[in-house]
Design a protein with these regions (language model features):
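Hydrophobic beta-strand segments of well-ordered beta-sheets in folded domains
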Residues: 148-150, 175-182
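Short, amphipathic alpha-helical interaction segments positioned at domain boundaries
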Residues: 68-93, 98
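Basic, amphipathic alpha-helical patches used to engage nucleic acids or provide basic targeting signals
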Residues: 158-176
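Nuclease-adjacent, charged terminal/linker segments that flank catalytic cores
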Residues: 1-79
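Active-site metal-binding core of divalent-cation-utilizing nuclease and nuclease-like domains
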Residues: 82, 105-149, 155-159
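Domain-level recognition of nuclease-like catalytic cores that cleave nucleotide substrates
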Residues: 185-218
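Extended alpha-helical interface modules used as scaffolds for assembling large macromolecular complexes
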Residues: 97, 101-105
């Protein structure tokens, strides 16, 4: 193929190094702005050139090859288990949609903060970190600065006690200004809203924004 876009391959590898996987849908939508025929050529070349290997769970999911993993060294994330990929794909779609609009200056994944407790304390601003969000990101503001946001993907409804613990954790995260919960159902939205409804949450402006995750699950 003429005018081979090395940057497309690089972006795909860098994404997989952080997230532990790459789906065909994410690659087509956010990383390969070409005709459908060219999208498939690039997708297939990721494996043929040795950058990736196909997941045993689906031929529409790729994971980094040993060769690519060696390039990224210790920073590379382990290959994501197939049971978590649907959940993580939703989070990735939100992040990539904002990044493509140049709205995110930086982001951190749960796995990255779990592996680096010092970073977790610094990024979240808590004396204790009993709960790490799925994603934390800095959203660019009109004033030229940024607003730190957290994103939680709720594909299943947890117990009320579990959400109560999550809400209490957020009370202590002084550096998180906006909390976003993407919920799969109205019942999940109701439980999350109730968990953050006490006076302490209102006084500290710890009231989350809720939206339907199915808007991004395509």
């Amino acid at each position: 193929m003429r005018h081979w876009r090395i940057d497309i391959v690089s972006e795909a590898r860098e994404f997989a190094a952080r997230w532990g996987f790459l789906t065909q849908d994410l690659f087509f939508e956010f990383m390969c702005p070409m005709s459908r025929a060219h999208k498939f050529r690039y997708w297939n070349s990721l494996v043929e050139c040795g950058h990736f290997r196909r997941s045993n769970a689906s031929d529409k999911v790729l994971i980094l090859s040993p060769k690519s993993r060696n390039i990224f060294g210790d920073a590379v994330r382990p290959a994501r288990q197939s049971i978590y990929i649907e959940h993580d794909t939703i989070a990735a779609r939100v992040v990539l949609a904002l990044k493509n609009r140049n709205l995110i200056s930086r982001y951190w994944l749960e796995d990255e903060l779990m592996r680096n407790p010092v970073d977790a304390f610094s990024v979240l601003g808590g004396e204790q970190v009993p709960r790490i969000p799925d994603v934390v990101f800095d959203l660019r503001s009109n004033a030229g600065g940024s607003v730190r946001c957290s994103l939680e993907i709720e594909r299943t409804t947890k117990s009320r006690s579990r959400y109560a613990k999550i809400a209490l954790a957020y009370l202590g995260y002084s550096k998180v200004s906006v909390m976003l919960f993407a919920c799969d159902s109205a019942s999940a939205e109701a439980v999350v809203r109730q968990s953050f409804s006490g006076k302490a949450f209102v006084d500290k402006k710890r009231v989350p924004g809720l939206f339907n995750l199915n808007e991004f699950d395509s």
